[in-house]
């Protein structure tokens, strides 16, 4: 799915929004953070992912990583989710993502990707996005397509976020 790193996207997935579609996975995700810190989950996770305490880092990384793994497919893939629990993967995945998020993707402005889309306006391309992508809402692909009209927008009708879903694989390869 298309990710623009806009504030509303981060809030949708990591603060409130997707939580209403996956309350079971959400409950597991937020257990890593005390209730008094849940008003800003990305920052709360950042403090734990950069903690000096290895157990604290790992618990936060697993919660973060499993949250995304559990929401990436239209139909939850248990093997995919369990792969997100592996310590080495979880630590790398969560720390890299969170680092970019707390730093605004190192963009000059929030909507930099859309703002700079005219730079590739003359280049043909294909935008593939799962209709039921909860991680990166389809509005991102729609906005990019409007800003990049030479790109073909292919919405896979029975897919979520993962590039490993059959329809997404077919559209990408």
Go through each PLM region and give its residues:
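A catalytic-pocket lid/entrance helix-loop region that shapes and gates access to the active site
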Residues: 1-46
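Active-site nucleophile elbow and catalytic-triad environment of alpha/beta-hydrolase enzymes
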Residues: 99-117
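Accessory cap/linker subdomain of secreted extracellular hydrolases
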Residues: 36-39, 43-84
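Active-site-adjacent alpha-helix of alpha/beta-hydrolase-fold enzymes
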Residues: 64, 138-152
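Catalytic histidine-centered segment of alpha/beta-hydrolase-like enzymes
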Residues: 135, 156-171
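Conserved alpha/beta-hydrolase "acid-adjacent" motif
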Residues: 108, 134-140
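Small-residue-rich helix-loop
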Residues: 79-90, 117
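Short beta-strand/loop motif that positions the catalytic acidic residue
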Residues: 120-121, 127-129, 133
């Amino acid at each position: 799915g298309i990710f623009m790193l806009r504030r509303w996207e981060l809030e949708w997935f990591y603060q409130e929004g997707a939580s209403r579609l996956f309350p079971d996975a959400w409950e597991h995700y937020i257990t890593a953070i005390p209730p008094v810190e849940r008003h800003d989950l990305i920052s709360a996770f950042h403090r734990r992912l950069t903690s000096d305490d290895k157990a604290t880092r790992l618990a936060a990384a697993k919660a973060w990583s499993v949250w995304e793994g559990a929401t990436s497919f239209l139909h939850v893939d248990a093997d995919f989710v369990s792969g997100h629990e592996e310590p080495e993967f979880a630590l790398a995945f969560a720390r890299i993502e969170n680092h970019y998020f707390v730093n605004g993707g190192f963009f000059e402005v929030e909507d930099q990707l859309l703002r700079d889309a005219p730079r590739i306006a003359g280049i043909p391309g294909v935008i593939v996005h799962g209709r039921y992508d909860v991680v990166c809402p389809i509005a991102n692909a729609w906005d990019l397509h409007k800003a990049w009209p030479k790109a073909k927008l292919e919405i896979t009708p029975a897919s979520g976020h993962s590039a490993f879903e059959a329809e997404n694989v077919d559209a990408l390869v």
